[in-house]
């Protein structure tokens, strides 16, 4: 569960390294987000000479959470960290690579480009 003020690792090569959630998108009273949800974030740490700088406001999609996700078949999956992929204004990934595994729930939410770039889909 990702709420406001949560920190997310960045799982792509967009130039950001750490994000802080400002708002979970999808409704005015939305309390938390999970895998596949879009969040508005502030860049808290960035690589030198990258496209994104500290303080930039970006949209990102959550790709991994430490809180387990229940699937329709009754199984659960969880990851070792909370991570997101930075998006551009067309909801496409800003980077050209995705690091680490992603959940297959992204495919159902329509983020096919991220699924195809990921090395593993669980």
UniProtKB/Swiss-Prot annotation:
UniProt-listed GO biological process terms: translation
Any one of the GO CC terms: cytosolic large ribosomal subunit
GO molecular function, one term: large ribosomal subunit rRNA binding
Source taxon at top rank: Bacteria
Entries under Pfam families matching the protein: Ribosomal_L14
Keyword field: Ribonucleoprotein, Ribosomal protein, RNA-binding, rRNA-binding
Keyword Kinase: no
Role according to the record: Binds to 23S rRNA. Forms part of two intersubunit bridges in the 70S ribosome.
Oligomeric and partner information: Part of the 50S ribosomal subunit. Forms a cluster with proteins L3 and L19. In the 70S ribosome, L14 and L19 interact and together make contacts with the 16S rRNA in bridges B5 and B8.
Family: Belongs to the universal ribosomal protein uL14 family.
Name of protein: Large ribosomal subunit protein uL14
Gene expressing this chain: rplN
